[in-house]
Every structure is written in structure tokens, then in C-alpha cells.
């Protein structure tokens, strides 16, 4: 037992380290702090809970057991997690008429039988150790001057803040001016969508979520003149590695593919008076989408 003489507060909170072979077991002698468990304790108890299912055990212990930023584990089995969730839900329930009790909520969610929360709620509800989102995924964007550099950076900031809180993010890039269109700065023309795909992708890779990168979905309308560049962006090795990409296809485009006739792309994509218009071979672009999806599983 090691105890610092200039920290008398530790008299009530002594961490005893008991070495048992390779495993170190922390036995907290505090009557105030929450109880902690070793990884081995949690793994073995959870394996018994899941009746020997090693995959379920590993996933729950690594992703959903309550932990703090130091890696200390505060839940021994999913029963502890369900009790935490039930306690917090009951606290909110008490603010409304005819509330469910903690035990009633617990019976609904225990053993993953009737209600199975999403991953983020399982981690975040009642969690006093981490700032975590209570939703798995978010779709973001903004109205108005969204294609300005300030608007593009604002979306980037929103993406990062959501990913810091364990949220997956999706946003559409159809509001960004196509490559070659005029802009009011020294560059004179827009760089198009591809560089901003890389920006958002890099932001995703920079934000670690407990050792794993965040999840990002980028999409574009087939009406956008940069749709082909968007579709090809991930074909170059090492590009846009932090995002998945999807194309929003409309009936008009598919009919043009069937009829083997040209298709008009424009920007803004819904404008009656577009500032940029481009005519393409619909069938050729469709074949490229199919080829890229076959080769790299994207675009979706």
C-alpha cells in the first residue's frame, strides 16, 4: 500500500494494488467513490452472462461497459448497464404524469429482450464520466450561403463536434459550386467538390472515438455538374479514406439511361435559372457508377 503523507484525504480512499500473476486488481477502499472492476473480472462475468458467446462478450466489454477517460471500468455485466439506463430514464419519467418506475424500465430492457437501445444510448444514458451523444447518427447542413468558405468550414466544425461525442455524421455536398464556376475571390473560379470531400474525410480521421475513427457519409445529387468527379474521388488510392460516398439518383436520370439520351446537370441543382449547365451522356455515367461500385463497393 502506498500512501502520500501530504494527502490526508486518501485515508478514506486508498487504492490497494493486489498483484496476482500478470493481472493487477484494484480494490478501492473508498466508501464514497463508485466501485471499479478489472478487465478480467468484467470479461469473465460478461462471458457467463452471454453463455459463452465470445463475440458478444468482447463487443460489450470494449464498447458499452461504463468507463472513464482513464480506462477504469464501472460495470461488470450488461445488467449493470441496463440498471444505469433504467435509473436515468426513470428520473426523466418522474417529471411527467404516470411515470414508469426504475424497476419497470429495467424489466423492459434487461437481457436485450423487448427493447434494445442503439449503441450511443447504451453508452451515453446515465453516463457521468463522458460527454456522449444519445443518437447514433446525424444529418447536418445549413440553409442560405452554404457554399461560401465560411459555410463549408461551419459544417466541418459541426461534423467534428458531433464526432467528438460519438455521433456518426452525414451531409450532402450538392450546395457547393461545381469546378470552374466563378467565385468572388482571387482564385476567380471554384475548385469544385473534390477538395472539400478530402477536407471532411481528414476531419473524420482526426477525431478518434475510443480508438476508432468516426463514421462519415458524403452524398451528392446526380443533377450536380461535379457528380462524376465525386463518383471517381475514391478510385485513387489513399483519397477520401475517412468517408463513404453515395449518389442521389432521380427518376429523370434513370429514364435517360433507359432511353439512352442526354441528361442535363445544373447548379444550383433545383434552380429554374441555373448559373452553370452541363449536358452528359446518362448511360455512360450510369455505367461508371456500376463499375466503381463493383470495383470498390462505392458509391452507394
What are these regions (language model features)?
Residues 1-300:
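Extended catalytic cores of very large enzyme megasubunits
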